[in-house]
């Protein structure tokens, strides 16, 4: 059996139209018809019947469809596995990673680890920190890298590093030239961009408002968008230092001293359900990595 026939069949079953099937698969309509006829001959049953310009599955076609989908899925998985083996991989490590960690420390971690462990295929999927623990519990990822600490009897949670939170602002000449920058003046002039980190904002914002009740805020839930807004002069924010190191070095932002309260630290955590050989190896690597 030619798997092209199966692919044509399931696509035709989806659209119930040979013309649309041909366009989707970049085939001619006669080729679609030939594929269906060949499959019908192979399995000795009629899969479609015509209703005017449309087609619809016969009872036999409807019964065969889930098996065709399963055959295609098995075929694609087998080809992916062969491709993985050809590349020299003997195992796969699935990571669920928060956007903030993926955008800061993950590239250097991945570069070092993959160079040292060429037999391990790495798969990285980005999720919000609040989702990661449940994904690990469900077995949808081997290790999670999250900005939220997890307290669970079924999960291990390792602190990777603590990142100081700093107040950053656009590179306004007045603030650059002023040796005694006043956080009060900055917060009076700019919007405070909040909730770009899943952990510290509720407590921090409450403390800021106790000292500066006049502060105007805008909720921006992604760190990279917050940084873009700051560089465009839209506002200021409290961000983990690692996320703005480059911008501070390139003078795209300036750091504002903030002494009204003790600013928090933002944590990064590795979460795992099992610590088998491949998970333990990666966790050991993280524990010795210089963040």
From Swiss-Prot:
InterPro entries: LysR_subst-bd (IPR005119), Tscrpt_reg_HTH_LysR (IPR000847), WH-like_DNA-bd_sf (IPR036388), WH_DNA-bd_sf (IPR036390)
Keywords attached to this entry: Cytoplasm, DNA-binding, Repressor, Transcription, Transcription regulation
Domain of life the protein comes from: Bacteria
SUPFAM superfamilies in the record: Periplasmic binding protein-like II, Winged helix' DNA-binding domain
Any coiled-coil regions, as ranges: none
Matches recorded under Gene3D superfamilies: Periplasmic binding protein-like II (3.40.190.10), Winged helix-like DNA-binding domain superfamily/Winged helix DNA-binding domain (1.10.10.10)
Primary location: cytoplasm
GO BP field: regulation of DNA-templated transcription
Disulfide bonds listed in the record: none
Subcellular compartments: Cytoplasm
Name of the protein in question: HTH-type transcriptional regulator CitR
Organism, as annotated: Bacillus subtilis (strain 168)
């Amino acid at each position: 059996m030619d798997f092209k026939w199966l692919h044509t069949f399931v696509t035709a079953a989806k659209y119930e139209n040979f013309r649309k099937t041909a366009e989707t698969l970049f085939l001619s309509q006669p080729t679609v018809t030939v594929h269906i006829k060949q499959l019908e001959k192979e399995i000795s049953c009629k899969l479609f019947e015509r209703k005017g310009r449309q087609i619809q599955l016969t009872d036999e076609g409807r019964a065969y469809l889930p098996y065709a989908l399963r055959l295609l899925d098995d075929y694609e998985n087998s080809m992916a596995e062969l491709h993985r083996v050809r590349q020299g991989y003997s195992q796969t490590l699935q990571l669920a990673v928060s956007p903030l960690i993926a955008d800061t420390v993950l590239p250097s971690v991945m570069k070092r680890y993959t160079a040292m462990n060429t037999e391990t295929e790495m798969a990285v999927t980005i999720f919000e920190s609040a989702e990661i623990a449940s994904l690990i519990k469900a077995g949808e990822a081997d290790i999670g890298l999250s900005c939220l600490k997890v307290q669970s009897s079924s999960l291990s949670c390792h602190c990777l590093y603590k990142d100081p939170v700093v107040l950053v602002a656009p590179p306004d000449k007045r603030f650059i030239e002023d040796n005694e920058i006043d956080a009060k003046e900055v917060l009076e002039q700019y919007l405070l961009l909040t909730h770009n980190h899943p952990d510290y904002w509720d407590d921090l914002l409450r403390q800021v408002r106790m000292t500066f009740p006049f502060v105007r805020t805008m909720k921006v839930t992604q760190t990279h968008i917050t940084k873009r807004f700051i560089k465009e002069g839209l506002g200021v924010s409290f961000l983990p230092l690692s996320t703005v190191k480059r911008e501070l070095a390139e003078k795209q932002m300036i750091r504002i001293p903030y002494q009204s309260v003790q600013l928090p630290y933002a944590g990064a955590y590795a979460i795992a359900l099992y610590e088998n050989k491949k998970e333990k190896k990666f966790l050991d690597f993280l524990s010795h990595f210089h963040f």
